[in-house]
């Protein structure tokens, strides 16, 4: 995602970031006001030095001697109160902004098309959601606090110094262009390095996530050394980028302070000349020097905060880049209460990337309500792509798909997907209770009895009742605490509860033992009843009983018919069938033979 030049500027990005504080503008404004009060106390402290020296030590004025201590106490009480309101108020606003940004990003991720996820690593997306947003939080608190409060402090102190002696103040101002030039150079370098750090954090997250999720494969194939080396490589890259920023920060701060001290030394040299001493009092001189010394702290913090600010801007650019991604198209306006289940593919073609050619080409297929259609073919023939287009996970390149004579492009996405249920081999379950997984997407509207009925129809209550917490059992990430057959039955129960008129079975009983398969087949028979069903690479028994078998090869339909009709033709399907039949006699699962049925 590329930004327009205006959006690419740091100021435009930061302005957009600050727009997220608008709902909390009163607390934000109160924090700004207390920043100004805090900054004024710095100038007040320097100003008190003049009457303290002249009135107390030189003139020995009793009134001054009595009031100065009280003024100092009052000054620091005000300073402490202003600091508390500023710090707490800004942190409160910043965490609200972080929450809002994360919610907006997460909702936007849910709306992005499948093609986006095909092109992006999940670790990179997680890094944006977690690491980048935290960098924005720092820019919204520490950076704002330092920029506004310390800038006001510097302006106040300079104004007081100019009031005391304009010539000496001018010497200090001579150093300002040099300091500004250094800060400008550091800002650009910080932002450039920050982008690289964010990318490297995404790489670290991605490698760690893959290794943790695939820990069984890593162990069984002895990949520990390889994964350790891969993680060390991305971790080292992150360290290098971070050290580049640390080096820039470490160099810039002392250089800026050195320039400021040179100005201070020049002022002291000039102020201690006899001609100048005759013009100013001791109190004026001490007050001026105090103001100069108080300047060093804000200048140092402004230089130091630059790294935080640039990291925040770079992170905000990354976040806004994600938010600028186009959500999946949902231009349909029509509703569909419940489809009969008639499906028609007309002259359908599709390609993931134009340069690589079509994955599906000129597909014409009509499916009547309640029919079971089996899609068979070698891996890569386009079976899964075809059903993905039916659910509009991708947009067709040409042609159209109709459900009950309605073009799916005219339907709202929610209406279309409400008509479809999916059961696949790679079941996605969530780290939640069994009940929440069965009623996923509709738990609040579903009674416990409905969940139990769906689980019973899916032959799942048999193992659920043996669990200590029953339906309230938490099944772990991706259902890791359950067996493969148990996860399949929960997926079937989820599809039964949804009660959609169109069902997609994607290798739904592959790689199961005999007992598990018996339960699954019985549950599937219940699930497929009175539904239009598309079966991908299903078990041979289901393929044989299909109303129509569609044979795909290199994205085209090369055969269609019933099981007996296709066998009689002695063509492509018959060859696949004989190959699976031979494997089954060798006690190998037909699907594990990877011939695509």
Curated annotation (Swiss-Prot):
Gene Ontology terms, MF aspect: ABC-type oligopeptide transporter activity; ATP binding; ATP hydrolysis activity; ATPase-coupled lipid transmembrane transporter activity
Entry keyword set: ATP-binding, Cell inner membrane, Cell membrane, Lipid transport, Membrane, Nucleotide-binding, Translocase, Transmembrane, Transmembrane helix, Transport
Location(s), subcellular: Cell inner membrane
UniProt protein name: ATP-dependent lipid A-core flippase
Superkingdom classification of source: Bacteria
Organism from which the protein derives: Nitrosococcus oceani (strain ATCC 19707 / BCRC 17464 / JCM 30415 / NCIMB 11848 / C-107)
Membrane topology label: Multi-pass membrane protein
Gene: msbA
PROSITE patterns in the record: ABC_TM1F, ABC_TRANSPORTER_1, ABC_TRANSPORTER_2, MSBA
GO CC terms in record: plasma membrane
InterPro entries noted in UniProt: AAA+_ATPase, ABC1_TM_dom, ABC1_TM_sf, ABC_transporter-like_ATP-bd, ABC_transporter-like_CS, ABC_transpr_lipidA, P-loop_NTPase, Type_1_exporter
Segments traversing the membrane: 26-46, 65-85, 144-164, 166-186, 250-270, 276-296
Root EC class: translocase
Comment field on protein domains: In MsbA the ATP-binding domain (NBD) and the transmembrane domain (TMD) are fused.
UniProt function note: Involved in lipopolysaccharide (LPS) biosynthesis. Translocates lipid A-core from the inner to the outer leaflet of the inner membrane. Transmembrane domains (TMD) form a pore in the inner membrane and the ATP-binding domain (NBD) is responsible for energy generation.
Taxonomic classification: Bacteria, Pseudomonadati, Pseudomonadota, Gammaproteobacteria, Chromatiales
Record-linked NCBIfam families: MsbA_lipidA
């Amino acid at each position: 995602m590329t930004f327009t030049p205006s959006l690419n500027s740091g100021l435009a990005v930061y302005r957009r970031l600050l727009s997220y504080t608008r709902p909390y503008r009163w607390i934000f404004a109160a924090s700004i006001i207390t920043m100004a009060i805090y900054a004024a106390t710095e100038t007040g402290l320097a100003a008190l030095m003049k009457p303290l020296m002249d009135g107390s030590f030189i003139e020995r004025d009793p009134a001054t001697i009595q009031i100065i201590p009280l003024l100092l106490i009052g000054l620091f009480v005000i300073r402490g109160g202003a600091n508390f309101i500023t710090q707490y108020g800004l942190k409160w606003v910043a965490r609200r902004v972080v929450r809002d940004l994360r919610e907006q990003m997460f909702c936007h991720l849910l709306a992005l098309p499948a093609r986006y996820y095909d092109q992006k690593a999940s670790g990179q997306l997680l890094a944006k959601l977690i690491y980048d947003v935290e960098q924005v939080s720092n820019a919204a608190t520490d950076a704002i606090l330092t920029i506004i409060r310390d800038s006001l402090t510097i302006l106040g102190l300079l104004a007081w110094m100019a009031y005391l002696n304009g010539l000496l103040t001018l010497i200090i101002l001579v150093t300002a262009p040099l300091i500004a030039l250094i800060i400008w150079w550091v800002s650009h370098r910080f932002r450039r390095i920050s982008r690289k750090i964010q990318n490297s954090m995404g790489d670290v997250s991605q490698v760690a996530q893959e290794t943790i999720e695939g820990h069984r494969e890593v162990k069984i194939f002895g990949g520990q050394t390889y994964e350790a080396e891969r993680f060390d490589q991305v971790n080292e890259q992150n360290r290098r980028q971070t050290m580049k920023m640390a080096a820039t920060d470490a160099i810039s701060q002392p250089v800026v302070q050195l320039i400021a001290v040179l100005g201070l030394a020049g002022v002291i040299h000039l102020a201690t000349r006899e001609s100048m001493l005759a013009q100013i009092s001791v109190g004026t001189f001490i007050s001026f020097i105090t103001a100069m010394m108080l300047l060093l702290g804000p200048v140092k913090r402004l230089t130091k905060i630059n790294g935080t600010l640039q990291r925040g801007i770079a992170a905000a650019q990354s976040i806004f880049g994600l938010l600028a991604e186009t959500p999946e198209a949902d231009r349909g306006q029509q509703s569909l209460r419940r489809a009969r289940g008639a499906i028609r593919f007309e002259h359908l073609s599709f390609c993931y990337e134009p340069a690589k050619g079509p994955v599906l080409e000129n597909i014409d297929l009509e499916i009547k309500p309640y029919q079971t259609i089996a899609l068979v073919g070698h891996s890569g023939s386009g079976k899964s792509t075809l059903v993905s287009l039916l659910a509009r996970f991708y947009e067709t390149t040409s042609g159209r798909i109709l459900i009950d004579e309605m073009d799916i492009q005219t339907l709202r996405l929610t209406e279309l997907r409400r008509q479809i249920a999916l059961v696949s081999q790679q079941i996605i379950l969530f780290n939640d209770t069994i009940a929440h997984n069965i009623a996923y997407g509709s738990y609040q509207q579903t009674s416990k009895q409905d969940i139990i009925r769906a689980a019973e129809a899916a032959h799942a209550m048999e193992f659920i009742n043996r669990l200590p917490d029953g339906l309230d059992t938490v099944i772990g990430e991706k259902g890791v605490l359950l067996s493969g057959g148990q996860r399949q039955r929960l997926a079937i129960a989820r599809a039964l509860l949804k009660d959609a008129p169109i069902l997609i079975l994607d290798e739904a009983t592959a790689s199961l033992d005999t007992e598990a398969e018996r339960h699954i087949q019985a549950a599937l028979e219940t699930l497929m009843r009175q539904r239009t069903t598309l079966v991908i690479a299903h078990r041979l028994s289901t393929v044989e009983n299909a109303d129509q078998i569609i044979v795909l090869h290199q994205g085209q339909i090369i055969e269609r018919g019933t099981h007996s009709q296709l066998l009689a033709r002695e063509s492509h399907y018959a060859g696949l069938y004989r190959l699976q039949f031979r494997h089954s006699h060798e006690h190998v699962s037909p699907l594990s033979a990877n011939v695509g049925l």
